[in-house]
Amino acid sequence: MPVGTYGVVKTIDFNDLNILGFDIILSNTFHIMLTPGINVINCIKGLYKFINWKKGILTDSGGYQIFSLNKNILLNDGIKFKQFYSGNFVFMTPEKSIHLQHYFKSDIIMCLDDCIRYPTIFKNSWKSVNLSLFWAKRCKKVHNKT
């Protein structure tokens, strides 16, 4: 599955992806939320029209990208992180992640998860899995409502 972080796969155009037989691309909720932004995607009526792609789109939750930032604060409600473009703080909740992926009109969406550094101890893994499960239930609830 080709990766199109911002919706566009680098170094290859969509005609070539079609010729190669790819039926889906992976895009990143976190990055698209920041640039070009939800307002742009919403005005254009979804990620498909923005990138002019007619096949499947899988969007991840953005959890790993937020985890990889040094300035993040993990809470039960979500993750507060410092935006690397502007320096402003943004709060990503499980519900917001799902809403964004619905705005993008993704075919396959992922729930927000807590990513932890490796190596780690069992206690940290246990806590991370339980938080991810808690968030997954919240994601499912909002997904089922929309």
Summary of predicted features, one role per range:
Residues 1-144:
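Non-catalytic, usually N-terminal nucleic-acid engagement modules in DNA/RNA processing proteins
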